[in-house]
Amino acid sequence: MRMIALVFASLSTLLTACATPTLFPSSVTSDMQLNPDFGVMVADPDVFKGSAVQLAGRIIDVQTSTNGTLIVAQQLSVQKYPAYGPVEASEPTTQFAVFYPGTIDPAGLWTGNKFMVAADMKESQMVNVDGAIKREPYAVARCMHVWKTGQYYDIADFPHSTDGYYPLEEQTYCRK
């Protein structure tokens, strides 16, 4: 009997260790489209209006207010296992805007940081990026996971960067 319990405990530990890590609570992602067609989203953003989606991006502009933070991002692809970060783009991609109705620490808002967001799509909005006003796909974040890479590093560069050994700081933010 003890041997069976020991085998069961070992198998449970092994299976748990092999499980795919998740970024967000299942209550946040249960109704989510994990990798929506971004080309359609850009061509006709209102097609996804009212949908819950998971998007990935690189921060290019941040505008804070008392209500929260508006992030304008370069779209990146979501990989098979989102917890490992977005897929880096070798060429410039389209942009989108996401509003996080809460507080994100200053290091989480650095230009170049990569993020994954679980969000509700809204109507496209006019956003100001470096003085140019453009209509962009617009979402309101439920939860957001940020890899604090800054603009000079990719997620894959950590923990061994040219500056030495630094573990990659990352954090998940969920609105209450």
Language-model segments: residues:
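OB-fold and OB-like single-stranded nucleic-acid-recognition modules
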Residues: 18-176
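Sec-dependent bacterial lipoprotein signal peptides
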Residues: 1-18
